[in-house]
UniProtKB/Swiss-Prot annotation:
This is GPI inositol-deacylase. The lineage of its organism: Eukaryota, Metazoa, Chordata, Craniata, Vertebrata. It comes from the Eukaryota. Residues 775-799 are annotated as: Disordered. Residues 33-641, 690-733, 839-853, 915-922 are lumenal. It is linked to Neurodevelopmental disorder with dysmorphic features, spasticity, and brain abnormalities: An autosomal recessive disorder characterized by severely delayed global development, with hypotonia, impaired intellectual development, and poor or absent speech. Most patients have spasticity with limb hypertonia and brisk tendon reflexes. Additional features include non-specific dysmorphic facial features, structural brain abnormalities, and cortical visual impairment. It is a multi-pass membrane protein.
Length: 922
């Protein structure tokens, strides 16, 4: 019956929208590289020693605990406190375990063993009872206060030691990183208790799903504090994102705000981290061996030899993090590296005058210095590029200042080099170094190993090539191509007009090589100059390689840099690069960045259909099918223009002042614009997806009611349609009071769920009664509903009354179907707090704070009355016309204020439901 109310064109549209949504979801959940993280292993059995907390503290936080990680002999030795190492505190995230510390703890222990425990780290971990803090924000403040107490407890464990620490380093995974940042907002917290903060896959900008006001209030408090106190915050902070493999927390949310006064913060995607170069999912980021090795190396380089603790020098801390996480020159970190190096010893000096040079070193018996005079090359070329496949940490490239072909001392240019997976390379613009006379490449004596060194001089215009990307709406039907015929080692393709998050492309690189015996490796690198989100692809030539191009962070308005596609190639190969729009990945970006707003658009569509049903009941006396009204009423032009106009007017000072006087919250569209998340036509696209979801959810709820009614009839004897309509049955006040007491004493979401189940039961019972009645009547397909009404005037009065009741029951079921759709979304949005309450029931019987309690007090009696409401009882209501007018502005309000604040949706939904219930009395 539900499907019969939709024409074939609309049905085809809904199926097509499902297809588009499937493409977008597939790109988000499956359209990324395979997991290239190596598993980190424990070489000894891991042990978690529980740290005894003060009794008052343990009583105040019965669900929380503090542990010290250890293995083997280290664990045995440190069971007897106090400790002697450097304290690091690990904070797990949403549903995270304190045992997630074992990967980095084990690697740090092995590193300490390698240096005979000259320095070592003590890794502590907090047990938050695997709380779902990403879904329920009421415990975030409690976690923050507990961590503060843990820090003080940890520092007491080192009392009396010669090099006792005065602060701890913190590693926060997921929401644990946000809790760590929130420590600074506590009144009694001393900022110098934290010397370093590293967060992994932490959504710093905004919550992934703002399901209650406690989460958004917590974010507002933390971010506002960091912005307003940026000048005084001296905490070195590193945020590492997982990249596209992490579909739970998109990387754009992990980037710390770039503040003019707070320069001690870095944000990077794991695919851009040197010696890591892989994307991680939300869980593997804590055990990915490549990333944990990088983190541990950074920790050991941060140690101050004098204090045997992490350095207090902010500049050094930032330099270490930059060295390991942003740009690695393939050298061990040095705080003050020597710029001038001695080039002495018994070495051979070879003069090279050609512009392109390759040297294959194998079993070299003596050191060789190859010198390249720069004077003549400056006249012809603009840049010099050198690379080496020997990935040791020794200096390998220098420059002479004197004019001779040999120099006793040279400028060490190795610090300006950069490490890639298979090479280390250096690119210099010659005009930036006018005082240099010679370039010197050093080849050490090697035994049993082989490596290749290449150098070439080139003109910028020959290697920096502009490649405009294809238009967004080309849908992959057109492409742009560049053919690289020169035998260069390095190319820079400037991807013009590529800077928005809604853009997505596929680049295909075809390499064709001349006959070579050895395997040739090429590296393709997407470099984003406005954020550290580079990604690398290694390809063997000859080959055809397809690479995805999409962004985590949009290009800032005042940034004029261009995204680059860097190619580290072979001179024996020719390359052909083709770029075209990827429609499926564009849909993926829509889902990735705006999928969380979909519930708001679904509810907006249902409200519009609900309005149509109420108005048809007022104007014609009958309620039309939900699907029919959805098709008729759910139009984007009824909602979007109002939001666009309000956003436009907010640009004027007088309107903004009026807006603030009315105490209205900030428009969600303005928030999205500030986060550079506004797609062209994004609201229209989401509205259409919302219409599709509203249709299929309506179909599902209608089918579920029919199925449940069939089961009811199979289990219970048939029931009759009610002849006496009673809005308030004798048991209704008692049931309402009981549910309100449940809400007050336990959890508001539980009471809402029970009320919802009661409402569904009443609807199922009505459906079963109607089915029983229809089965007991003779079938006459020739008569329509109107003809039945007309003919019934000539029949027995009792039968006339029953037929009217049957028609009214059908109308009531249509209305109830829409109300169930609305209530279902309220229940779904309240479920996180219910799940949290059930998980912590052994510690707390009453959820406090409870985001659903105020809503439950209003919704429980409303649902109780609506469950006993029939359309015949409200047709003549004076309030019906007013009630039918409310859903339209509320549908606009849902989009304006609920797309980025999902917890506001129930507030917009219960208003028309409450008015609907009041129609029974007015």
């Amino acid at each position: 019956m539900f499907l019969h109310s939709v024409n074939l064109w609309n049905l085809a549209f809904y199926v097509f929208m499902v297809f588009l949504a499937t493409l977008g979801l597939w790109d988000v959940f499956f359209g990324f590289e395979e997991n290239k993280c190596s598993m980190s292993y424990m070489f000894e059995y891991p042990e978690y020693q529980k740290i005894e907390l003060p009794k008052k503290l343990a009583k105040r936080y019965p669900a929380y605990e503090l542990y010290l990680y250890g293995e083997g002999s280290y664990a045995e030795e440190h069971k007897i406190l106090p400790l002697t190492g450097i304290p690091v505190l690990f904070l797990p995230g949403n549903a995270g375990s304190y045992k997630q510390v074992r990967s980095i703890g084990s690697i740090a222990l092995r590193k300490a063993e390698d240096i005979d425990f000259k320095y070592h780290f003590d890794f502590f971990s907090v047990n938050f009872n695997e709380e779902l803090v990403a879904l329920y924000g009421g415990s975030l403040q409690k976690q923050t206060k507990f961590v503060h107490e843990c820090i003080k407890t940890i520092l007491k464990l080192y009392k009396g030691q010669e090099f006792a620490p005065k602060s701890v380093a913190i590693i926060g995974h997921s929401m644990g990183g946000l809790v760590a940042r929130a420590l600074l907002t506590l009144k009694n917290f001393k900022h110098d208790l934290i010397n370093l903060l590293i967060t992994q896959a932490t959504p710093h900008v905004a919550p992934v799903m703002p399901l209650d006001r406690f989460i958004t209030d917590f974010y507002t408090t933390v971010n506002n504090y960091w912005i307003l106190n940026a000048r005084h915050i001296n905490l070195t902070t590193l945020s590492v994102a997982g990249g596209f493999r992490d579909y739970q927390v998109r990387s754009g949310l992990t980037f710390l705000p770039k503040l003019s006064h707070h320069t001690s913060a870095l944000s990077v995607v794991s695919s851009a981290v040197p010696k890591t170069w892989v994307s991680t999912d939300h869980l593997s980021i804590v055990w990915c061996k490549q990333l944990q090795l990088t983190t541990v190396r950074a920790f050991f380089d941060l140690i101050d030899a004098d204090t045997k603790q992490i350095t207090q020098n902010s500049k050094k801390k930032l330099s270490v993090l930059y060295h390991h996480f942003i740009r690695h020159p393939s050298k061990h970190f040095e705080e003050n590296p020597a710029i001038i190096s001695d080039l002495t010893g018994t070495s051979m000096w070879v003069l090279v005058k050609v512009s392109k040079w390759t040297y294959v070193a194998y079993n070299e018996s003596e050191k060789i210095y190859f010198t390249f005079p720069l004077e003549n090359h400056r006249k012809i070329y603009t840049h010099v590029y050198c690379q080496s496949t020997m990935l040791d940490t020794n200096s390998w490239i220098f420059a002479c200042i004197n004019s001779t072909s040999m120099c006793l001392q040279g400028v060490d240019l190795s610090w300006k080099a950069e490490l890639l997976p298979t090479i280390k390379y250096l690119t210099l613009r010659l005009q930036d170094y006018p005082s240099l006379s010679h370039l010197v490449v050093y080849v050490p004596s090697v035994r049993g190993s082989k490596f290749v060194v290449d150098c070439e001089f080139f003109k910028k215009e020959k290697r920096y090539i502009q490649l405009p990307v294809t238009h967004l709406f080309s849908f992959g039907l057109s492409s742009r191509k560049v053919v690289l015929n020169t035998n260069g080692l390095y190319y820079n393709l400037e991807l013009l007009n590529f800077g928005q998050i809604y853009q997505a492309f596929k680049i295909n690189v075809v390499s064709k090589c001349s006959a070579v015996k050895e395997e040739i490796t090429s590296i393709y690198r997407l470099h984003i100059p406005w954020s550290y989100e580079d990604s690398l692809t290694i390809a063997q030539a000859p080959s055809s390689t397809e690479i995805s191009l999409k962004l985590h962070i949009a290009q800032p308005e005042n940034n004029t840099h261009v995204a680059l596609f860097k190619m580290y190639t072979s001179s024996d190969c020719r390359y052909e690069v083709t770029v075209k729009t990827s429609f499926s990945q564009i849909l993926g970006q829509v889902v990735r960045f705006h999928g969380g707003a979909l519930p708001a658009y679904v509810v907006s569509n249902i409200l519009l259909a609900y309005r149509g049903q109420l108005y048809s009941l007022f104007s014609t006396g009958c309620c039309l099918e939900y699907a029919t009204m959805l098709d008729k009423e759910a139009k984007p032009y009824k909602v979007d223009p109002f939001v666009i106009i309000i956003k436009f007017l907010l640009g004027y000072k007088w309107f903004k002042e009026l807006w603030d006087v009315l105490l209205l919250p900030e428009l969600d569209a303005v928030i999205l614009t500030c986060q550079s998340m506004c797609f062209p036509l994004i609201s229209l696209i989401l509205f259409l997806f919302g219409t599709c979801t509203a249709y299929w959810s309506g179909l599902l709820s209608s089918a579920s009611v029919r199925l449940l009614s069939s089961l009811w009839l199979a289990l219970k004897r048939p029931s009759e349609l009610p002849k006496d309509i009673k809005m308030i049955s004798p048991d209704l006040p008692f049931l309402t009071i009981v549910l309100i007491i449940v809400s007050w004493t336990t959890c508001g979401a539980l009471a809402i769920l029970l009320s919802y189940l009661y409402y569904v039961f009443k609807v199922v019972h009505l459906q079963a009664s109607l089915t029983t009645f229809k089965n007991s009547q003779p079938v006459n397909p020739k008569h329509s509903r109107r003809s039945e009404k007309k003919s019934n005037h000539h029949k027995d009065s009792s039968i006339h009354h029953l037929r009217l009741s049957a028609n009214d029951a059908e109308d009531s079921l249509r209305m109830h179907s829409t109300v169930i759709n609305l209530l279902t979304w309220i229940v779904l949005l309240s479920m996180p707090s219910l799940i949290y309450w059930l998980k912590n029931l052994r510690y707390y019987f009453k959820l406090n704070p409870d985001p659903c309690k105020p809503l439950a007090f209003i919704l429980i009696p409303t649902m109780a009355i609506l469950g006993n409401t029939y359309t015949v009882s409200i047709k003549s209501s004076k309030l019906l016309k007013t009630t039918s007018q409310f859903p339209l502005p509320l549908a606009v309000g849902v989009i304006a204020f609920g797309s980025a604040h999902l917890y506001r949706l129930p507030c917009f939904v219960f208003i028309p439901l409450l008015l609907h219930a009041l129609c029974n009395f007015m």
